[in-house]
Amino acid sequence: MQVTDVRLRRVETDGRMRAIASITLDEEFVVHDIRVIDGNNGLFVAMPSKRGVDGEFRDIAHPINSDTRAKIQEVVLAEYERVGEEEATAVTEEESESVSAE
């Protein structure tokens, strides 16, 4: 199984969620609502979940083994970092343009 596409949207919240992602597997299957969470030990990926009638959250879709979970986390967090670098570059370019316009 290969993750063939990652779409990520950073979010600004008061909580620990930093982004929401969708991944495409083998160009055939999409999983939406994967969350990037800023946990006590750094960033991690939380699979889409739904609150049951008992109040507990249950994953809607999740990897069967730890290798697959690690692969998904690796590509999603890499995209998170890439998007962050692009945003930082865009802000730096805007600041440079406003300084040169003065």
Curated annotation (Swiss-Prot):
PANTHER family: SEPTATION PROTEIN SPOVG-RELATED (PTHR38429:SF1). It holds the Pfam family SpoVG. NCBIfam families: PRK13259.1 (NF009749). This is Putative septation protein SpoVG 2. HAMAP family: SpoVG. The keyword Ligase does not apply. Belongs to the SpoVG family. GO terms for biological process: division septum assembly; sporulation resulting in formation of a cellular spore. Could be involved in septation. The keyword Coiled coil does not apply. Keywords: Cell cycle, Cell division, Septation. It comes from Listeria monocytogenes serovar 1/2a (strain ATCC BAA-679 / EGD-e).
